[in-house]
């Protein structure tokens, strides 16, 4: 799902991990559905957090790594234009619906031990997926699928923008709006 969000909607890793179920409106756009990007999840050094404008931070997640010098931080996106609402494709809408059902099943399976962090991307125990974990999972998947072009996760976003540029007949402004 994360790969599809990056390829189809040109989302950054932090934007993907910053998504919450409430950001999805399955009925919008005459039933086509939309997703609103308005947050980014980043791993930030604790020393840098002290210098960060508190108005930029929505939430600092509890430390899961003992003695860590960094924390997972849910904050405003990279730029003002990064906040945007995008249309879903039918397959992406169906995949998101299935994903939400999987999250419900994960919560039931944990029998009261689930810690719902509120994010769309969560570990089976309900805690948020860190950006470095998503990148590692993607690298592992890539190594298992040599038939696909070797590309880093962020490269999916660039490929998406290139595809959109071709499909739009070179309309740079339209692509800039989609990519934030």
Task: Describe the residue ranges of each PLM region.
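Short, intrinsically disordered, charge-balanced linker/junction segments flanking boundaries
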Residues: 2, 175-180
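Short, basic (Lys/Arg/His-rich) helix/loop patches that form interaction surfaces
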Residues: 9, 86, 102-177
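Basic, Lys/Arg- and aromatic-enriched nucleic-acid-binding interface segment
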Residues: 1-13, 17-19, 29-32, 81-83, ...
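Charged catalytic carboxylate motif
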Residues: 1, 91, 95, 133, ...
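Glycine-centered loop/turn positions within well-structured domains
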Residues: 14, 22, 35, 94, ...
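Flexible loop/turn segments at secondary-structure boundaries
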Residues: 12-13, 44-45, 95, 128-129, ...
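Conserved tyrosine-mediated DNA breakage-rejoining catalytic core shared by Y-recombinases
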Residues: 19-101
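Active-site proximal loops enriched in glycine and acidic residues that flank catalytic Cys/His/Asp
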Residues: 5-7, 13, 20-21, 28, ...
């Amino acid at each position: 799902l994360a790969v599809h969000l990056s390829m189809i909607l040109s989302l950054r890793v932090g934007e993907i991990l910053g998504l919450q179920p409430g950001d999805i409106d399955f009925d919008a756009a005459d039933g086509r559905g939309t997703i609103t990007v308005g947050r980014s999840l980043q791993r930030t050094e604790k020393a840098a957090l002290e210098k960060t404008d508190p108005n930029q931070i929505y939430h600092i997640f509890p430390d899961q790594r003992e003695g860590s010098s960094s924390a997972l931080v849910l904050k405003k996106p990279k730029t003002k234009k990064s906040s945007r609402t995008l249309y879903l494709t039918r397959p992406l809408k169906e995949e998101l619906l299935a994903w939400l059902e999987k999250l419900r099943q994960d919560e039931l399976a944990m029998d009261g031990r689930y810690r719902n962090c509120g994010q769309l991307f969560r570990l089976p125990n309900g805690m948020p997926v860190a950006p470095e974990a998503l990148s590692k999972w993607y690298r592992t998947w890539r190594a298992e699928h040599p038939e696909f072009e070797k590309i880093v996760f962020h490269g999916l976003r660039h490929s998406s923008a290139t595809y959109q540029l071709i499909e739009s007949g070179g309309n740079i402004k339209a692509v800039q709006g989609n990519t934030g």
